[in-house]
Amino acid sequence: MNITSTYVFPIPYVHLETLKAEVQRLCDLGVLKRVNRSEWAAPTFIIPKKDGSVRFISDFRELNKRIKRKPYPIPKIQNLLMQLEGFQYASSLDLNMGYYHIELSPDAKKLCTIVLPFGKFEYQRLPMGLCNSPDIF
């Protein structure tokens, strides 16, 4: 796979420390790992949240163009709800950061590298934004 994009999106200074803290948190959780070299890195930008934190979004479009899609049939909500007829109890789960529970293969880790103004980081866990992430999850 020949991909060479390493464009760095500018990050507003007001959000830089918050972004660094979020990246450090994800490194501490084993989701990201700092790398010194990478032939490819997806540009990453941020979206400020209402609570003052930031969500960073990696632009995996170039990588997605080259990935062979492995679709998994995701059931429709209506069909799932119809199957609940007659049930007395139901549970609700918050799958916040759910993708991050799935470890990537060594080859996939090399492809899932992101670039920020302060360095490159390799995803160790399944990132959001890859075309196969919902199907794998």
Where are these regions (language model features)?
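Conserved hydrophobic/aromatic pocket- or pore-lining residues that grip, position, or stack substrates
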Residues: 26, 44, 59, 80, ...
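Metal-dependent nuclease catalytic cores in nucleic-acid-processing enzymes
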Residues: 79-88
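Reverse-transcriptase-like RNA-dependent polymerase core
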Residues: 1-4, 47-55, 84, 93-124, ...
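Reverse-transcribing Pol proteins
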Residues: 1-72, 119-120
